[in-house]
Regions:
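Long hydrophobic segments that form regular secondary structure
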Residues: 8, 35, 44-45, 60
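Hydrophobic, well-ordered beta-alpha structural blocks that scaffold small-molecule cofactor pockets
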Residues: 56-207
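Conserved S-adenosyl-L-methionine
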Residues: 40-51
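Hydrophobic C-terminal alpha-helix "anchor/cap" residues
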Residues: 34-35, 177
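Extended interfacial segments that mediate partner engagement and assembly in macromolecular machines
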Residues: 14, 19, 24, 44, ...
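Generic beta-strand/beta-sheet core signal
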Residues: 2-5, 45, 107
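Structural beta-strand/beta-sheet cores of well-ordered domains, especially the beta-sheet scaffolds
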Residues: 24, 38, 53-57, 102
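Short, glycine-/aromatic-enriched active-site segment of Class I SAM-dependent methyltransferases
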Residues: 2-24, 28-32
Length: 207
């Protein structure tokens, strides 16, 4: 049995956050090819949703060498569209952030949120990170050099909050503030900014 993150979710949701610990990313097709190349056949697979989408596969070793052909057209189309939409996504996110005349904080200083800020290059619009982990507080995020605050050090009620936590933890943070401007930057989430949701819907049925 194997369980790996399903990168199809990144393609589908234009999620440009990455875990630097993950050397390889898979979807069902590429995982199947890796297994076939090592003479394993998938006998069952399913997906689950927790902090993102994951693929679970059950595979068995074949006694005889398996024959297979590689067809990567579907993956190629997904990758090209994901790449093509990057600049559009970046510009729309910058436009979205520029409209606010308040401090903007990313709540949750984890690997995905830090990499998202750095890879998209939006550090200049962000006032800092907020995190409840005391070991992170009053330190600085590599590259963006943004300070990490505790929730008591900033006025969250009068700020824009970008949720950089897993969807299942969002409500716990929302209860801490009366801010009217709370958005997620980590799919899957119902709190993504509208421009992001529109981008997802417009590209949902592209082949």
């Amino acid at each position: 049995m194997l369980e790996v993150p399903d990168h199809d979710m990144n393609f589908e949701n234009f999620d440009y956050s990455f875990w630097e610990e993950h050397v390889n990313y898979f979807n069902l097709k590429t995982l199947e090819l890796i297994l076939l190349n090592n003479n394993f056949r998938i006998i069952h697979h399913e997906t689950t949703l927790y902090s993102g989408k994951a693929i679970i596969v059950f595979a068995e070793k074949n006694k005889n060498k398996l024959k297979f052909s590689i067809s990567s057209n579907d993956n190629f189309i997904k990758i090209k569209n994901y790449q093509k939409q990057f600049n559009t996504f970046k510009k729309q996110l910058e436009t979205f952030l520029k409209k606010f005349k308040k401090n903007i904080y990313v709540y949750g200083c984890g690997a995905r949120s830090c990499n998202f800020v750095n890879l998209i290059g939006i550090g200049k619009y962000i006032s800092g990170f907020v995190d409840d982990n005391k070991n992170k507080q009053n330190k600085y995020v590599p590259d963006s050099n943004l300070k990490i605050f505790s929730s008591n050090q900033v006025n969250l009620d009068d700020s824009v909050i970008l949720l950089g936590v897993n969807a299942e933890n969002e409500n716990a943070i929302i209860k801490k503030t009366n801010s009217k401007n709370i958005y997620s930057i980590l799919p899957p989430s119902t709190r993504l900014p509208d421009f992001w949701k529109i981008l997802i819907e417009k590209n949902k049925f592209k082949k």
